[in-house]
């Protein structure tokens, strides 16, 4: 969409449009495909992974990480960034699995969870969203997988319900954007 907006604006001077992007966090949109006409509200994928891996630096119990992501540009980016940042910040951590699955086509994640469980992973990192995160967490609970989960979108549609229904509260950690508007009064002055 960002490419389309840029091309449209090039062809229609004086009738330019601006692409307000709420949720596409692929790094390419603010790197190699950066456009003056694109404005993103959310942090990009690298910023989110930097938050996760910076936190993981403080978690000595994390020894084995499994990466599972949706097979499209975003999921491929998450796996690449996660592997690079873990290597940089936690070289002692072993990546015991790195899996891509079809986007929004899997209805039973049990085979994927079996691989995660067999790998001995104590932590799972995923960019999954929508039904893919909900069904992934449900399958994890059904299989008794007690790993910690670090996610970009477990707080999105279906995620909180899945976490509640599966008893994984306290095991699923999610990166969210927001402004609690709790700045001190002095910061609110012009």
Give the positions of each predicted feature.
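Ligand-binding clamshell of periplasmic/extracellular solute-binding protein-like
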Residues: 1-2, 21-29, 126-134, 151-161, ...
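Short, solvent-exposed loop/turn and secondary-structure capping segments
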Residues: 2-4, 31-32, 78-79, 137, ...
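Beta-alpha junction/loop-to-helix N-cap segments that form part of ligand/metal-binding clefts
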Residues: 1-31, 41, 101-109
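Extracellular/periplasmic periplasmic-binding protein-like sensory domains
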Residues: 35, 42, 140-190
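Hydrophobic/aromatic residues located in beta-strands of well-ordered beta-sheets
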Residues: 19, 65, 95, 149-150, ...
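Extracellular/periplasmic Venus flytrap/periplasmic-binding protein
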Residues: 26-28, 36-144, 181-187
């Amino acid at each position: 969409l960002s490419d389309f907006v840029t091309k449209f604006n090039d062809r229609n001077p004086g009738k330019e449009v601006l692409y307000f992007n709420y949720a596409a966090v692929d790094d390419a949109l603010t790197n190699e495909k950066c456009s003056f006409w694109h404005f993103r509200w959310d942090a990009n994928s690298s910023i989110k992974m930097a938050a996760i891996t910076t936190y993981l630096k403080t978690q000595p119990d994390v020894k084995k990480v499994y990466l599972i992501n949706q097979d499209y540009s975003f999921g491929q980016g998450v796996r690449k960034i996660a592997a690079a940042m873990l290597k940089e910040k936690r070289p002692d951590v072993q990546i015991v699995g790195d899996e891509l699955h079809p986007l929004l086509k899997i209805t039973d994640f049990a085979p994927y969870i079996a691989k995660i469980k067999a790998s001995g992973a104590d932590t799972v990192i995923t960019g999954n969203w929508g039904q893919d995160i909900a069904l992934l967490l449900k399958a994890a609970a059904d299989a008794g997988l007690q790993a910690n989960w670090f996610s970009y979108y477990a707080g999105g549609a279906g995620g909180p319900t899945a976490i509640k229904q599966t008893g994984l509260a306290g095991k699923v950690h999610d990166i969210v954007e927001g402004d609690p508007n709790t700045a001190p009064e002095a910061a609110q002055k012009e």
